[in-house]
Structures are given as C-alpha cells and as structure tokens.
C-alpha cells in the first residue's frame, strides 16, 4: 500500500515590517520637497522603502496618504504653538517670540535647509480644486488663529495690550506674518532675517 504523505507547507518569508509613523514622516518629507502633484508614487516608495502594495495596504492611495501627512503636520505644528503660548506668567512679547522661534525650527530641516511651512507650501495650490485638502487646510488655519486669539485675549485682560485692542484682529495679523515668514523661508531668506521679521511683528502687536 502506498501511503499518502502530507505535503509539507512551503515556508514563506516573514512579511517585511514597516513602522507606519516613520514611513509617514518620510512620505511627508517627499511631499514637502516636491509638492503633492510633483511627487510620484515611485518617489514615495523609494523614500519609505515600501513597494506599492504595501503602501496601499498601509495608507491607501496617494491622496489619502497626503491628507494623513497634512493632518499630522497640523497636529505637530499646533502642539508647538500651544507649548509656546501656554505659560500664562510669561510676558506676551516673549510668548510670541517663542511661538515664532518654534515655527522657524519647523521651517528649516535638521541640516539647515529652508523648506517653509508644509501646509502653506504644498496645500494652498491643491486646495483650489480639492475640497478635502481645502477643508484640512482651513481647519488648521482656524485652530492656529484661535490659539493666538486666546493668548492675546489673556494679554489684553491682564493689561499687556490696550483695553480696546481686538484679539481676533491681532491674531490674524500674527498668523499672516507667520505665513509670510514661511513663504520667505521657502524662497531662501536666511533664518536670522526671518527672525527679525518676527521680532518686528511682535513689536507692532505689543505696541
């Protein structure tokens, strides 16, 4: 009698493990450098070390990946903003300079290369025709203005600003200056010059 031998299952290689946060960070850097439309999936795969099936499984398509990168950027940027503005015992001028310095540290890469604001640099063009990107961009700007307004209102209530100062208007002024700094950083203006723009903005706000 011939015995049927069970075929031994073929051993498969262990699936390659990816760190989703590290991959998202590398994808963000790719978008930051080339923009959403200018960054190909092949470039993202090369940056993350993931093939297309793995990339799709982890993040979905390129659009979904970009939205994740944009949301993560706003989260980190707003954390830095709130940390800079949080200490109520710090004078307003000092708090605002900490805010601008924190953003400048984001606008320059670890090796000192200027890259500006990820949201302003990559999302503003796409937001014209893409409602999802437009929504995430607008919400990030709204939260930034709200955080600045809350700190400026506190300063007015403590007598650091004129009693008739409008915190909402001053918040928009502060964020508009930040966006100008971001664009200038992207254009290659040196960090010292950008910080001087921030300092003068703080002087105007504090009166």
Outline where the language-model segments fall.
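C-terminal peripheral helix-coil segments that are non-catalytic and often amphipathic
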Residues: 1-10, 98-109, 142-146, 150-154, ...
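Arg/Lys-rich, glycine/proline-spaced intrinsically disordered segments
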Residues: 11-15
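Short, basic, alpha-helical segments at the C-terminal edge of helix-turn-helix-like DNA-binding modules
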Residues: 71-77
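Short, solvent-exposed amphipathic helices
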Residues: 76, 132-143, 150
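Amphipathic alpha-helical segments used for helix-helix packing
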Residues: 94-95, 110-132
């Amino acid at each position: 009698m011939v015995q049927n031998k069970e075929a031994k299952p073929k051993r498969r290689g262990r699936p390659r493990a990816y760190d989703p946060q590290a991959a998202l960070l590398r994808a963000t850097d790719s978008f930051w450098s080339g923009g959403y439309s200018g960054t190909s999936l092949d470039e993202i795969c090369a940056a993350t070390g993931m093939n297309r099936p793995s990339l799709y499984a982890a993040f979905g398509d390129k659009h979904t990946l970009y939205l994740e990168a944009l949301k993560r950027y706003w989260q980190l940027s707003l954390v830095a903003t709130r940390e800079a503005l949080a200490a109520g015992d710090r004078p307003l001028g000092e708090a605002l300079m900490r805010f601008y310095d924190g953003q400048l540290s984001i606008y320059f890469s670890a090796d000192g290369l200027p890259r500006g604001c990820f949201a302003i640099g990559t999302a503003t063009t796409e937001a014209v025709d893409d409602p999802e990107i437009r929504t995430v961009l607008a919400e990030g700007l709204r939260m930034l203005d709200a955080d600045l307004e809350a700190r400026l209102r506190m300063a007015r209530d403590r007598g650091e600003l004129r009693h008739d100062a409008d915190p909402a208007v001053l918040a928009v002024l502060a964020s508009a200056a930040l966006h100008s700094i971001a664009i200038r950083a992207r254009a290659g203006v040196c960090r010292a010059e950008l910080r001087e723009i921030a300092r003068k903005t703080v002087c105007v706000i504090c009166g």
